[in-house]
C-alpha cells in the first residue's frame, strides 16, 4: 500500500475537523434565564447535573503510540490513583470510550487509523494530546511523522513534556473536567451537528505568566 503525505490547506474548503465551524458567542443559557426565570433555571440545573456526571465518569480509550503511554498507565498505579477523578475505567473499544488520549508519536501510516477510531467514538467525546510528539511532532521533523494530531482531529487539552509525568496527565484530566463542566450540549439525541457550546478556557501559560514573572529567587538544578 502506498502512503502519501498531503499538506493541510487552511484556506481550502473542508467541513471536517479540525477545520470545523467555530465562533465566539455568549452563553445561550443566559438568554434563556432572561426569557423565563423558572425554565431557564431548570435548564441550567439540568445541564449542571448532566455535566457533573460526564466529567466524573470519563472512560479513556486504551490507546498508546509510544513512550508517553508508559507515563499514562503509571497514573493508574496506587501511588497516583487516577481513580480519584473517575477516569480509571479503561476501554478496549472506541465505542465504549469517551476520551482518546493520543500518547506518543503519530506517524503518517497511523494517522488514518487514529482518524477511524475517533470516528467510531460516540458523542460526547474528547481528545487529550499527550507529549511533545503528539502536540507538534516533537524532535521528529520528518516526512513520516504528523506534526501534531490536531492536523486531523480536534484536541481539547495539550500536555507538554517528553515524556510528561503522570502528574501532568492528571492535571490535564482536571482541566478537561473543568471544561466539561462548562459545556452546553443538547440534552437529547441529535442527528448531525450537535451545536456544542464550549467555554473559552485560558491556557496555563497565560494564566501563570504573571506568577512566573514575579519569581526572583530561582532554585538551582540540584534542589527539588
UniProtKB/Swiss-Prot annotation:
Phosphoprotein recorded as keyword: no
Enzyme Commission numbers on file: 7.1.1.-
Gene Ontology MF, one: 4 iron, 4 sulfur cluster binding
Subcellular location: Cell inner membrane
Disulfide bonds: none
Entry-linked InterPro entries: NADH_UbQ_OxRdtase-like_20kDa (IPR006137), NADH_UQ_OxRdtase_20Kd_su (IPR006138)
Main location per the UniProt record: membrane
Pfam families, alphabetized: Oxidored_q6
Membrane topology: Peripheral membrane protein
GO BP: aerobic respiration; electron transport coupled proton transport
One Gene Ontology cellular component: plasma membrane
Swiss-Prot/TrEMBL catalytic activity: a quinone + NADH + 5 H(+)(in) = a quinol + NAD(+) + 4 H(+)(out)
Entry keywords, A to Z: 4Fe-4S, Cell inner membrane, Cell membrane, Iron, Iron-sulfur, Membrane, Metal-binding, NAD, Quinone, Translocase, Transport, Ubiquinone
Cofactor note as given: Binds 1 [4Fe-4S] cluster.
PROSITE patterns linked: COMPLEX1_20K
Domain of life: Bacteria
Cofactor: [4Fe-4S] cluster
Residues reported to bind [4Fe-4S] cluster: 67-68, 133, 162
Coiled coil: none
Family, per entry: Belongs to the complex I 20 kDa subunit family.
Function: NDH-1 shuttles electrons from NADH, via FMN and iron-sulfur (Fe-S) centers, to quinones in the respiratory chain. The immediate electron acceptor for the enzyme in this species is believed to be ubiquinone. Couples the redox reaction to proton translocation (for every two electrons transferred, four hydrogen ions are translocated across the cytoplasmic membrane), and thus conserves the redox energy in a proton gradient.
Subunit record text: NDH-1 is composed of 13 different subunits. Subunits NuoB, CD, E, F, and G constitute the peripheral sector of the complex.
Protein name: NADH-quinone oxidoreductase subunit B
Organism of origin: Klebsiella pneumoniae subsp. pneumoniae (strain ATCC 700721 / MGH 78578)
Species classification: Bacteria, Pseudomonadati, Pseudomonadota, Gammaproteobacteria, Enterobacterales
Gene encoding the protein: nuoB
Amino acid at each position: 500500500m502506498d502512503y502519501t503525505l498531503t499538506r493541510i490547506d487552511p484556506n481550502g474548503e473542508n467541513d471536517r475537523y479540525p477545520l470545523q465551524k467555530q465562533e465566539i458567542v455568549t452563553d445561550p443559557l443566559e438568554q434563556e434565564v432572561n426569557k423565563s426565570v423558572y425554565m431557564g433555571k431548570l435548564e441550567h440545573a439540568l445541564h449542571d447535573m448532566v455535566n457533573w456526571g460526564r466529567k466524573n465518569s470519563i472512560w479513556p480509550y486504551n490507546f498508546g503510540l509510544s513512550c508517553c503511554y508508559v507515563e499514562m498507565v503509571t497514573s493508574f498505579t496506587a501511588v497516583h490513583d487516577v481513580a480519584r477523578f473517575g477516569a480509571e475505567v479503561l476501554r478496549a473499544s472506541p465505542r465504549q470510550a469517551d476520551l482518546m488520549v493520543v500518547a506518543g508519536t503519530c506517524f503518517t501510516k497511523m494517522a488514518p487509523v487514529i482518524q477511524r477510531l475517533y470516528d467510531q467514538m460516540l458523542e460526547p467525546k474528547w481528545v487529550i494530546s499527550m507529549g511533545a510528539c503528539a502536540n507538534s511532532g516533537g524532535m521528529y521533523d520528518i516526512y513520516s511523522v504528523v506534526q501534531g494530531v490536531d492536523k486531523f482531529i480536534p484536541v481539547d487539552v495539550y500536555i507538554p513534556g517528553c515524556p510528561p509525568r503522570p502528574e501532568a496527565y492528571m492535571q490535564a484530566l482536571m482541566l478537561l473536567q473543568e471544561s466539561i463542566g462548562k459545556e452546553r450540549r443538547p440534552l437529547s439525541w441529535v442527528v448531525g451537528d450537535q451545536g456544542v457550546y464550549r467555554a473559552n478556557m485560558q491556557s496555563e501559560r497565560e494564566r501563570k505568566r504573571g506568577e512566573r514573572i514575579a519569581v526572583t529567587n530561582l532554585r538551582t538544578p540540584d534542589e527539588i
